[in-house]
Each structure stands twice: as C-alpha cells, then as structure tokens.
Swiss-Prot record:
Protein name (Swiss-Prot/TrEMBL): Outer-membrane lipoprotein LolB
GO BP term, pick one: lipoprotein localization to outer membrane
InterPro entries (alphabetical): LolA/LolB/LppX (IPR029046), OM_lipoprot_LolB (IPR004565)
Intracellular or extracellular location(s): Cell outer membrane
Species this chain originates from: Glaesserella parasuis serovar 5 (strain SH0165)
Family: Belongs to the LolB family.
An example Gene Ontology CC term for this record: cell outer membrane
C-alpha cells in the first residue's frame, strides 16, 4: 500500500499550468461584523435549500500544504448518496490520476496504473493517505456549506456558513469558508480552507452541478 498511497504525492506534485494555483489562494476570512443566530429565518431557509441538494458534482482545484511538501491537483467530486461518492484527482501535465470511491463496503483507492485497494475502515484509509484523520463522510456536507446541526459554527451577515471546528480522533480541523459563488441561489462555496495546525487543505470550486 505504501507505493499506492505514495502515488498520491507523486500524482499531485505536478504544478498546474495555465491557471492560477490554489496554493496561492488566501486563507483568511473577513470576520463577520454581525454573527447571525442559528435560528435566524433567512439562514434556516438557506440551510433548507442546501439540504435539498442531494446528488451533486463539484470540480476545481485542490491544494495541500505541510512543512514537508506542497502540491496541487485538479479534482472532480461526484456525490450521489452517503455510501456512493467519488473523488478523482489529476494533473493537466500528466496522464496520472488517483481516485477514491466510497461504496457500501468501505472505500477503494485506485490509480491510473491499475493498482487498487479496498478498506472497510474508511477513517484508517484516509489517515494512510494524508497522514491524519480526515472525516471525508462529513466533508460531503461541508463542501456545500452545510454544517452539522449540533456543531458550533458561525454564520455571517450574508447567511452563509463562515467557519467551524471539527475534532476527529484527536485532530482538530478548523474549517473556514473564504469565498462563495454569490451569482447563484443558494450561494455555494468557492474557496474553503481546512487547517489542523500542521497541514492546510485549500479547495477551490470552479464548477457546481446538481
């Protein structure tokens, strides 16, 4: 499995040509001048619209930063159900790609060279891939700007999810929504930054479909 998980870095290390890299995207958000309560009617209306988006796809760029390395990739996220979604990462400078596919048996990781592995323990596989626990099942909702109902999150004056923290297996992820696509209803995230103290994930979503 070392060769397969190592391929993630080898696949993504290729710089993205012809476009502005997500690695240079800002990480800070403008702190809300007014914090909107969770029972606010407009926020609840927005939340209801997000909840109705069941199957969707998101395409854009993914960036990873740690003390040891930096890399970026194109990504294609296809979500159908909680046990049927996939993430494909690729470079426009190489034919190499890597795919994560969630199914009822767990998760399968495969590469463009034909290697694959399936694990029932999704959390363990994600930790092997990026080195720390990452809640990819919850991420399926976060990427829409939809928080968990009982979580401690912040809503900005535009009735958008602004930020929240999420602890998983001793790792605290700080999630910030830096920018939204405001030319569509409901507003959907354009730039999301996740940090855990030593690692930063930047996700820029260029295209939404649902």
């Amino acid at each position: 499995m070392k060769k397969l998980t190592k391929l993630l870095s080898l696949t993504l290390l290729f710089a993205l040509a012809g476009c502005h890299s997500v690695l240079d995207a800002p990480t800070e958000i403008t702190q809300p001048s007014v914090t909107i309560p969770h029972n606010d009617a407009k926020w609840q209306q927005h939340l209801a619209q997000l909840t109705q988006i069941n199957a969707y796809s998101a395409k854009g760029q993914f960036g990873y930063i740690s003390p040891e390395e930096r890399f970026s990739s194109h990504f294609d996220w296809q979500y159908k159900t909680p046990t049927n979604f996939g993430l494909t990462m690729s470079s426009n400078l190489s034919s190499k790609s890597l795919k994560l596919q969630r199914n009822v048996y767990g998760m399968t990781i495969s590469d463009s060279e034909g290697r694959s592995r399936t694990e029932a323990d999704v959390a363990m596989l994600m930790e092997e891939i990026i080195g720390v626990s990452f809640p990819i099942d919850q991420f399926a909702y976060w990427v829409k700007g939809q928080p968990e109902q009982q979580s401690n999150y912040v809503v900005n004056e535009k009735r958008q999810l602004a930020q929240f923290d999420y602890a998983v297996n001793g790792t605290l992820w700080k999630v910030r929504f830096v920018e939204y696509h405001e030319d569509r209803q409901p507003n959907l995230p354009k730039l999301i930054v996740l940090e855990n103290g030593s690692q930063t994930l930047k996700i820029r979503i260029d295209h939404w479909a649902y």
